[in-house]
């Protein structure tokens, strides 16, 4: 997935546009500085969809978590459990990332942490 990323966000009062502008501009400036280049880094504007239904949230989690498998970056589900650039490794408890809201995601899959992690992995 060298040419794109999937990010599932809860938008705040400032809205998604302001956050994405800061994120993408900051990344482009940092990347250009590190690689001694200038100009645009991204080809198009980001794409966003609104998730208003509970069932759709779970489907989005599954779609995003399985993307490294579909792209051939992780060859099996056990390898995906350890893949560092996907939230799946956080949900199953293999890694911790400050950017991943593990507890929020787990709440959708069960009442206890252990049960939720197991159910989420099974769902994926």
Located regions from the model:
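Short Pro-Cys-Gly-centered "Cys-loop" motif that presents a nucleophilic cysteine in a tight turn
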Residues: 1-3, 10-124
